[in-house]
Amino acid sequence: MISTRRLAAATVLLALAVQGAPALAQREIVQPLPGAGEQKLSDALSRLARNSQDVTALLDAGEAALELDDIDAAIGFFGRANELSPGNPRTSVGLARAYTRSHRPIEALRLFAEAERAGVPDTRMAQDRGLAFDLVGDAASAQQLYRLALDNGAGAETVRRLALSQAISGDREAFEATLLPLLRDGDVPAFRTRAFGLAVLGDAEEAKDIANTVLPAGLGARMAAYLDYMPRLTRAQQAAAGNLGVFPRTSSI
């Protein structure tokens, strides 16, 4: 188990290594052993304690923070690495992934393109680059990249992203077929994706039935309030809602 005290120490190191960047959130990790992301972050922070200008350690820390879903910290680490080593393609990919997940897709796509020009293969970026395209409403490019990612071993999250993108494109048959194996396996996030996809396709009642009966009570209730609005959103807004949980204000719909 990683204690709060240890995470607090990590936060201090982050503040030292990333000048002015948001600190890593302190939280109790209730697990018998630290996960891979936590171990990777702990190792990177130890190296930064010895040398705060260790670019590789900063990049490792940024990637670990992404694994732990601490996007602000990841941006801080990658930003500091970019100051020390401008134009590093690994930094471009890391920042692009973080910007995608913080709903900054235009900046992300620019950085993905920079990384590609620097020689980073699309297979290394396909999953998150696909999401960035979905977040600007380009579902065709997104789906091409999701399939590339799946051909190279990407997992269930990419399957769910592809299915939702197909629903956004209006292809219900493909949406259902893509999601079915995960639904058969009882994958709860797949049921969430199904609810969003059905709502996008105009079947809000079935979507709300799923939200209210299959998903955890709190999540289902929060989702149900938005499902009626999904067909009225732009493609980019639908992708942001279904993938990131980012909704426009109802007054602006």
Describe each PLM feature range:
Residues D60, G94-L95, D128-R129, R161-L162, ...:
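Canonical tetratricopeptide repeat
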Residues A57, T91-S92, M125-A126, T158-V159, ...:
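TPR alpha-solenoid repeat register
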Residues Q144, D151-V159, S165-I253:
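Extracytoplasmic and endomembrane cell-envelope/extracellular-matrix remodeling and assembly machinery
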Residues S46-R47, R80-N82, E114-E116, L148-A149, ...:
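Canonical positions in the second alpha-helix
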Residues I2-A8, V12-D72, G76:
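N-terminal leader/linker segments that initiate helical-solenoid repeat arrays
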